[in-house]
C-alpha cells in the first residue's frame, strides 16, 4: 500500500508537468513557484492528515486534469462519485485543500508578475507583459507625451499638477477571503520572493523555507469561513487596514517617483506638496443603500475612528521628524515663532518617550514640531474620548480642527530650510510628511453618504402631509420642483420636532443631523442611488439646509438603469437651468454612473454603450452651461459589473469625459489586488495617474458615425435578446435558482449588506453582486456575454461587410476593443461543460431545454467573438494570461464538481451516496471530524454546508473575482 501511495504521489508531479503549459519567456518562473508551493502544501497535508488524504487530493487533481484534456462529461461524473464517497470530515479537508491550493497558485502568479516587472525595469523596457497596452509606467507616459505627441514638458507638468484621481474604497460584499488569511498570504508572498533572490546564503534559504512551511500550515489551519457576518464597523476597519499597512507609506513614495520621472523630461521642479494628484474616499459606514445595518450612529463612529487613526499615524511619525530636523540655523520668522512657543511652555512632558524635557531654543525646528506633536496628541485623545463616551474633557482649542492649522507650522519649517540653503533637507521626510497631510487630511478619508432616492421622497412626503399641502409622492415632477425651489429660496424652517416620523424617515433625518454635527472635512459626496430626475437632487439640498448642515455636501445623482442613463442628460440640463442651483454649485458638478445595475438590467453590450453615450451627452450639457463635470465611475471587480484592467478602462472612456478629474470605486475584492502589498499600491497609483494624464492630453479617437449606427443597432438587438431570456421567460428565474448556488450565497457571510433589495421578487430585486456571483461560480458567466451573439449575428446576416466594420472597430476604437477583449477573457475562464453538470444534477428535466439553448448560444457567441477579434483561439495575444488560467483549471474543476454534488445533497435529502471508510490518519473522532463541529448550527447533514462554502470561496479565488 505504502509503495502504491508513493508511486501515486510521484505521479501528481508528473501530471502537473503534463498539464502545465511550457515557459512563455526566459524569465518565466511561474511553474517553478507554483510547484514549490504545491509540494510544500501537499507535504503539510500528509503530515497533518496522512497519506490517504494526500492520495485522495492527488486522485481528484488527476481526474480533473483528464477532464481538462478531453472535456469528457463522464470524467466529471467519475470525479463526482469519488468526492461524494467522502465522509463529512474528509470532504471538508479535500474542499479546503483545493481552495488553499488555488490561493497559493494566485500568490505564485503575483510573485511572478512582480519579478518580471522588476526585470523589465532593470532592462529599461516596459513594465508588464502585454507591453504598453495594459500598463502605465509614469516615466514612459511622460516621454511618450513629449517625444511622440509633441507636448512641451511644461504642458505635461501643468496638466499633472492640476489633475485629481479620487479612489473610493467601498465595502462591497465581495472580499471573500478573511483578513486573518490575507495577512498570512502576504507573508507567503514575501518568503517566496526572497527565496528566489540573488544574494541568498544556504542558511537564509533554509530559514526562509521553514518560514514558508510555517505560514502555509498556519493558513491551512485557519478557519476559512466567517462564522458571523461582518458589521459595517468591521468592514471599515478592514478597509482602513490597507491605509495603515500600504497606502500611508505608498503615497509619498509614489509622489517621489513622479518627481524623479519629471526629471527625465527636463522638469527639475517637484510636484507641489498640495497638488491634489491622489485622493481617497470611502463608502464604508456611509453607504446605506439597501443596508439597514448602516445607521447614523455607525456613520458617526466610522468618522471618529478614521480621525483617531489619522491622528495616531501622524503622531507616530512626528518624533522621527523631530530627530531629523536638529538644525540650529533658521529664518528670522521661524526663530521668532520658536522663541514665543518656548517661553510659553515651561513643563516637562513625562507621557512622551522622546523629547520629554523642555526643548532648548537652539533647536528651533524641534520647538515648532514639539507644539505640533502636543496638538496631535490632544487631537487623538479627544477623538478617542468622543468615540468611547460621546464627550471629551479636552478643549477643542488645543487640538487641530482644520488642515490649514496643521500645515502652517510645517510650511514654516519648509520655507525656513529653503531660505537657509537647506533645501535638500526640506525635500526629505518633511516633504513626505506634508504630502501625507495634504492627501489624508485630519479625516484620513472622506466618507461619501449614499442613500436611495425613494427614502428622500418619503421624508418630503411626511413633511408635505404634515403641512397639509398634499402628498409629495403623488405630485408630478414639475410640482415637486416648484415646491422644492420655493422652499430653497425662502427662509422659513419647514418642520419642527412635532413632525410625525416613521423609523425610515427618522433614520434619514438623523443621518443629516450627524453630518451637521461632525467636522465638514469628514465628508465627500452625498450620492443618490436610483436617481431619475432633478427633484431627486433638490430634495437633498433642502434636507441639508433643514438639518443645519453648515457646509453642505456636494450632491451626486447616480444613474444606474438603462432608462435612467438615457434620461440623465435631460435631468442634468433641467438642474443647470435653475439659477438657484447654478449659484449653489459654483461651476462644478459630479455625476455617478453605475455599471452593475445597468448590466443586470440590459446586459453588458447595451449597458456599456449606454454608459458611453450617456457620458458624452452629460459632458455636452455641462459644456453648454459652462460647468466642469466630474464623472464618478461605479465599477465592480467583475467584468459583468464594469471591471477590467484599469489602464485600458480609462483610455477607452469617451474623449473629453475625464479632463483631469477621475473618480472611481475600488470595490471589495479589488482592494486586496490593488493595495494588498506596497508594490501593488504603487502600481495602482501609477496606473490611475498615468492613464488619467494620457486620456486628457491624448484623447482616444471618437467613434465614426457608421460605427455609432452599428452599435445602436446591436444594442437594441442585444437588449431584446437579454431581456427576452432574463425577464420575459416565465421559467428563467426558476432555472437560475436551480442551476446556480444563488440561494445559498447568503451563507458566506461576506458582507454586512443583504443580497436582496426587497425580500421577495425575481431578478429585479436581486442585487447585482449575487446575480453575477452565482453565474461566476458555475463558470457560465451568463450576464457578461448574453446578447453579444444575437447582436453580431444580426448585423452580419444583414450585411456581410459589417464583419469587416466590426474588425475595423476592434482595431481602431479603444472602447470597442476593451469591451471585446474583456468578454474574450471571460470566455477563457468559462466552461459550459461545468454548467451542464450543474443542470444535470440540480435542474428538473422540464427546464433542461433552457440550459441547452443557453449553452448553444454560448458556443455561437464565442465563435462570433473570435471572428470579430480576428483570433483563431481564445487569448492568443496574451500567452501569460493563457498560461495562468490553464494552471488554475484543474483545481477549479474539482471544486466545481464538489460544489454541484454538495448542492445536490443539500437540496435533495433522498439523494443516496456510498461513503467509503474514513481516510484522515487519526481516528475518526479526531481532526477531520472536529472540523465538522466548527458549524454546530447547520440545518443540513454534517459537513455539507461548510464543504459548500469552501467550494464557493475556492472558485472565487480561482476566477479571481466574486461578484
Curated annotation (Swiss-Prot):
It comes from the Eukaryota. The active site is at residues 172, 600. GO terms for cellular component: apoplast; chloroplast; cytosol. Pfam families: PEPcase. It is found in: Cytoplasm. Gene3D superfamilies: Phosphoenolpyruvate/pyruvate domain. Its EC number is 4.1.1.31. One of its GO terms (biological process) is photosynthesis. Its cofactor is Mg(2+). GO terms for molecular function: phosphoenolpyruvate carboxylase activity. Through the carboxylation of phosphoenolpyruvate (PEP) it forms oxaloacetate, a four-carbon dicarboxylic acid source for the tricarboxylic acid cycle. NCBIfam families: PRK00009.1. This is Phosphoenolpyruvate carboxylase.
Amino acid at each position: 500500500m505504502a509503495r502504491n501511495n508513493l508511486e501515486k504521489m510521484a505521479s501528481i508531479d508528473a501530471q502537473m508537468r503534463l498539464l502545465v503549459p511550457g515557459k512563455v519567456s526566459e524569465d518565466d518562473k511561474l511553474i517553478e513557484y507554483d510547484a514549490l508551493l504545491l509540494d510544500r502544501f501537499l507535504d503539510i497535508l500528509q503530515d497533518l492528515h496522512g497519506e490517504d488524504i494526500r492520495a485522495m487530493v492527488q486522485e481528484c487533481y488527476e481526474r480533473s486534469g483528464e477532464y481538462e484534456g478531453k472535456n469528457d462529461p463522464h470524467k466529471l461524473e467519475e470525479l463526482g462519485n469519488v468526492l461524494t464517497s467522502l465522509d463529512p470530515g474528509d470532504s471538508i479537508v479535500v474542499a479546503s485543500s483545493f481552495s488553499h491550493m488555488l490561493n497559493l497558485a494566485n500568490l505564485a502568479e503575483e510573485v511572478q508578475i512582480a519579478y518580471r516587472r522588476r526585470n523589465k525595469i532593470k532592462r529599461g523596457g516596459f513594465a508588464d507583459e502585454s507591453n504598453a497596452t495594459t500598463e502605465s509606467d509614469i516615466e514612459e507616459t511622460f516621454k511618450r507625451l513629449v517625444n511622440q505627441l509633441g507636448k512641451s514638458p511644461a504642458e505635461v507638468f501643468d496638466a499633472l499638477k492640476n489633475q485629481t484621481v479620487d479612489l473610493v474604497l467601498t465595502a462591497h460584499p465581495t472580499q471573500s477571503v478573511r483578513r486573518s488569511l490575507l495577512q498570512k498570504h502576504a507573508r507567503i508572498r514575501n518568503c517566496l520572493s526572497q527565496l528566489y533572490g540573488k544574494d541568498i546564503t544556504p542558511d537564509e534559504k533554509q530559514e526562509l523555507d521553514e518560514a514558508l512551511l510555517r505560514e502555509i500550515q498556519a493558513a491551512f489551519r485557519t478557519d476559512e469561513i466567517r462564522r458571523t457576518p461582518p458589521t459595517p464597523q468591521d468592514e471599515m476597519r478592514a478597509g482602513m487596514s490597507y491605509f495603515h499597512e500600504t497606502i500611508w507609506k505608498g503615497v509619498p513614495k509614489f509622489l517621489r517617483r513622479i518627481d524623479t520621472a519629471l526629471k527625465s523630461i527636463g522638469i527639475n521642479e517637484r510636484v507641489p506638496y498640495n497638488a491634489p494628484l491622489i485622493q481617497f474616499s470611502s463608502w464604508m459606514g456611509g453607504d446605506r443603500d439597501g443596508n439597514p445595518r448602516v445607521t447614523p450612529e455607525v456613520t458617526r463612529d466610522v468618522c471618529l475612528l478614521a480621525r483617531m487613526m489619522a491622528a495616531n499615524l501622524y503622531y507616530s511619525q512626528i518624533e522621527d521628524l523631530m530627530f531629523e530636523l536638529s538644525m540650529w540655523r533658521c529664518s528670522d520668522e521661524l526663530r521668532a515663532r520658536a522663541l514665543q512657543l518656548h517661553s510659553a511652555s515651561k513643563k516637562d512632558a513625562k507621557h512622551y518617550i522622546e523629547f520629554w524635557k523642555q526643548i532648548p531654543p537652539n533647536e528651533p525646528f524641534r520647538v515648532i514640531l514639539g507644539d505640533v506633536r502636543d496638538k496631535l496628541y490632544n487631537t487623538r485623545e479627544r477623538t478617542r474620548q468622543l468615540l468611547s463616551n460621546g464627550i471629551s474633557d479636552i478643549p477643542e482649542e488645543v487640538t487641530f480642527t482644520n488642515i490649514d492649522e496643521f500645515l502652517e507650522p510645517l510650511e514654516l519649517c519648509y520655507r525656513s530650510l529653503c531660505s537657509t540653503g537647506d533645501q535638500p533637507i526640506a525635500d526629505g521626510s518633511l516633504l513626505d510628511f506634508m504630502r501625507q497631510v495634504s492627501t489624508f487630511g485630519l479625516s484620513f478619508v472622506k466618507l461619501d453618504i449614499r442613500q436611495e432616492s425613494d427614502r428622500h421622497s418619503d421624508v418630503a412626503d411626511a413633511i408635505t402631509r404634515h403641512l397639509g399641502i398634499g402628498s409629495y409622492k403623488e405630485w408630478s415632477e414639475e410640482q415637486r420642483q416648484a415646491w422644492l425651489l420655493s422652499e430653497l429660496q425662502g427662509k422659513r424652517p419647514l418642520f419642527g420636532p412635532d413632525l410625525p416620523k416613521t423609523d425610515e424617515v427618522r433614520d434619514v433625518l438623523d443621518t443629516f443631523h450627524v453630518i451637521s454635527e461632525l467636522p465638514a472635512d469628514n465628508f465627500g459626496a452625498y450620492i443618490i442611488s436610483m436617481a431619475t430626475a432633478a427633484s431627486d437632487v433638490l430634495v437633498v439640498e433642502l434636507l441639508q439646509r433643514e438639518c443645519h448642515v453648515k457646509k453642505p455636501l456636494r450632491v451626486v445623482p447616480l444613474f444606474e438603469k438603462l432608462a435612467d442613463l438615457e434620461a440623465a442628460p435631460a435631468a442634468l440640463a433641467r438642474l443647470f437651468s435653475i439659477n438657484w442651483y447654478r449659484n449653489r454649485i459654483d461651476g462644478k458638478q459630479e455625476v455617478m454612473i453605475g455599471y452593475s445595475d445597468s448590466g443586470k438590467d440590459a446586459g453588458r453590450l447595451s449597458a456599456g454603450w449606454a454608459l458611453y453615450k450617456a457620458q458624452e451627452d452629460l459632458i455636452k450639457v455641462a459644456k453648454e452651461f459652462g460647468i466642469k463635470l466630474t464623472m464618478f465611475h461605479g465599477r465592480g471587480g467583475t467584468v459583468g459589473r464594469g471591471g477590467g484592467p484599469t489602464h485600458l478602462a480609462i483610455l477607452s472612456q469617451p474623449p473629453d469625459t475625464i479632463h483631469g478629474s477621475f473618480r472611481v470605486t475600488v470595490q471589495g475584492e479589488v482592494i486586496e489586488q490593488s493595495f494588498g502589498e506596497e508594490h501593488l499600491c504603487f502600481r495602482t497609483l501609477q496606473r490611475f495617474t498615468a492613464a488619467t494624464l494620457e486620456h486628457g492630453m491624448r484623447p482616444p479617437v471618437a467613434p465614426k458615425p457608421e460605427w455609432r449606427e452599428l452599435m445602436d443597432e446591436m444594442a437594441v438587438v442585444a437588449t431584446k435578446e437579454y431581456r427576452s431570456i432574463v425577464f420575459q421567460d416565465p421559467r428563467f428565474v426558476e432555472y437560475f435558482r436551480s442551476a446556480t448556488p444563488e440561494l445559498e450565497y447568503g451563507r458566506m457571510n461576506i458582507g454586512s449588506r443583504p443580497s436582496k433589495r426587497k425580500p421577495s421578487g425575481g431578478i429585479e430585486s436581486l442585487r447585482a453582486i449575487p446575480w453575477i456571483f452565482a453565474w461566476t461560480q458555475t463558470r457560465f458567466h451568463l450576464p457578461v456575454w448574453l446578447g453579444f451573439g444575437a447582436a453580431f449575428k444580426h448585423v452580419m446576416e444583414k450585411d456581410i461587410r459589417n464583419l469587416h466594420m466590426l474588425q475595423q472597430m476592434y482595431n481602431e476604437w479603444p472602447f470597442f476593443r476593451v469591451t471585446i477583449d474583456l468578454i474574450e477573457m471571460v470566455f477563457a475562464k468559462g466552461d459550459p461543460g461545468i454548467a451542464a453538470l450543474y443542470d444535470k444534477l440540480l435542474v428538473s428535466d422540464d427546464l433542461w431545454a433552457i440550459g441547452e439553448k443557453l449553452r448553444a448560444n454560448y458556443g455561437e457567441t464565442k465563435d462570433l467573438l473570435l471572428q470579430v477579434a480576428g483570433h483563431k483561439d481564445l487569448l492568443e495575444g496574451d500567452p501569460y494570461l493563457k498560461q495562468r488560467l490553464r494552471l488554475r483549471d484543474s483545481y477549479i474543476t474539482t471544486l466545481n464538481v464538489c460544489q454541484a454534488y454538495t448542492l445536490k445533497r443539500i437540496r435533495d435529502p433522498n439523494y443516496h451516496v456510498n461513503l467509503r471508510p474514513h481516510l484522515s490518519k487519526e481516528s475518526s473522532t479526531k481532526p477531520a471530524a472536529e472540523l465538522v463541529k466548527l458549524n454546530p448550527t447547520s440545518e443540513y447533514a454534517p459537513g455539507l454546508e461548510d464543504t459548500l462554502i469552501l467550494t464557493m470561496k475556492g472558485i472565487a479565488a480561482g476566477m479571481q473575482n466574486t461578484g
